[in-house]
Regions:
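N-terminal assembly/interaction segments in proteins that build large macromolecular machines
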Residues: 1-122
Length: 122
């Protein structure tokens, strides 16, 4: 209704709604999750990313798993110094979004607080 049939406006509205839902969950405890790794095909670049959420159920979803792999690949390519720097960076696959925004989008979609807690690149 708010988009009046305009798919671009609808997409922006959905993303804003997801970001708002994610912000409401930021104080929730995150004890589940995984460590994701990425090794470039040449074996000379790699990274580790610890991504956490509230439950094992969400940690096992395709959305969460894909997010972890994408962030690990980003860390290997861009080599941020720390999590704070990572979250502010433009996402390699879509420079119109930051890493923080893609994390919040998945958080809004899953209904759980999702956080990157540590990173390493080599």
């Amino acid at each position: 209704i708010e988009s009046e049939g305009d798919t671009k406006v609808a997409k922006v509205w959905i993303e804003k709604k997801g970001l708002k839902r994610a912000a409401e969950k930021e104080d929730r405890t995150t004890e589940a999750g995984y460590v994701f790794s990425y090794v470039h095909f040449n074996g000379k670049v790699g990274s580790l990313v610890k991504l956490v959420c509230e439950t094992d159920f969400v940690a096992k979803t395709d959305d969460f798993q894909n997010l972890g792999r994408e962030i690990a690949m980003h860390v290997a390519g861009v080599k941020p110094e720390n999590v704070e720097e990572l979250l502010k960076q433009d996402y390699l696959r879509d420079s119109s979004k930051t890493i923080e925004q893609i994390v919040k989008l998945v958080s809004g979609k899953t209904g759980e607080n999702i956080r990157v807690t540590s990173i390493a690149s080599m």
